[in-house]
């Protein structure tokens, strides 16, 4: 991976290029793929208090070892999970535009992002001998358009901070024999009041759901109220999780035409839960700054086929 950075007056730019080689062979089937990974970042400072930034990158995504294995697993009396040794890597194109500004007690931003996958690996369901066979295939396309607005206010310097962000995510999932669109609105709000060694905070969130293939996965909704007391390196905390709901809910929805399904998770213990915390910061020795790796060549694939519904 190589990267070149530069600055011309109010204009900052960064250009990067990398390469990946993907190779897999299983039971006489497999693939070999070479892909360039270019990235670009352009930032223009409109004023000392506002800027606009554009980023773009493309990369290749490879099938997992478990999905490539030509094996079958029985999910239940009506469903079979099957691997697919014919899966191929696919390209992902991502770009975003971000505007940020600050004026007085206000800070805000607007974000627009788009991600497109060409021939992505997504789920497929067929009917064979009275059983539903679920596997993965290279489908037509998948894309997500995400817009988000954020604002923060500090009316009394650091004594009170209020933050809110909200947005919309639109998904378009095109398979070989299905087409789904899904739009989700989400938000996240926090408030933090601090006085001397005491702090009081609250957080409420409606999560951004995800849609991929034919499955909509629900992100969690929650709210929290808490208090902290800090004395030197010691911090004592207390918070209550979801105090105004009876049950935490989660789950997935599958919109397949042959075998649609809904999965729900209900956890009563995650509502009106009290949490107490104690922490102590041990600060000794030398401090070193760290740099994040841009490229991570690590294999974490167990090769086990997921037998979930």
Show where each model-derived region lies.
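Outer-membrane beta-barrel channels and translocator barrels
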Residues: 8-11, 45-49, 92, 102-106, ...
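Residues on the lipid-exposed face of transmembrane beta-strands in outer-membrane beta-barrel proteins
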Residues: 2-6, 40-44, 97-101, 147-153, ...
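Transmembrane beta-barrel strands of outer-membrane/channel proteins
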Residues: 15-21, 42, 54-58, 99, ...
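Outer membrane beta-barrel strand-and-loop segments of large Gram-negative receptors
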Residues: 88, 103, 107-168, 174-188
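Outer-membrane beta-barrel signature, preferentially recognizing the C-terminal barrel domain
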Residues: 48, 60-109, 116, 134-146, ...
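Outer-membrane beta-barrel translocator domains and adjoining extracellular loop/strand segments
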Residues: 25-34, 65-73, 78-80, 112, ...
